[in-house]
Amino acid sequence: MRIAFASEDKLGLEGQVSMHFGRCPFYTFLEVENGVVKNWQVMENPYFGNHVPGKVPEFIHSQKADVMIAGGMGPRAIEFFDGYGIEAVTGAFGKIKDVLQAYLRGELRGAGACHHDHPESCRHE
């Protein structure tokens, strides 16, 4: 299984999950087999600072992810991921390695679109 994480940094498993999936600077991709991380890779968000709706889900799909985990994402992004057959998971925070374990234990499932008031700094897909 290939799991993508919205990331604040390039620290891999020690990195922090980003609260805003489409506007994070990096994505961390993990190859997980039988609950064990076999490989990981950090890639820059090619649309960081140049938001185009639907392009980030397309990028994540092109990287062959099965799951996308982030702190939050908007309903349109969730629809794009659904269309690609990628499980969108929200509500994640903290270190990627800890969030991965929570996901594998079944503590994080499905996506809930963000419905809080959006100040200028909080914009979702």
Residue ranges and their predicted role:
Residues M1-H51, K55, F59-S62, G83, ...:
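Non-catalytic interface/targeting segments
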Residues K64-V67, I86-E87:
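Short active-site oxyanion
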Residues A70-G71:
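Short His-Asn-centered micro-motif
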Residues A77-I78, I96:
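Short, well-ordered alpha-helical microsegments
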Residues I78-Y84:
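Short Gly/Thr/Asp-enriched flexible loops that form oxyanion-binding sites at enzyme active sites
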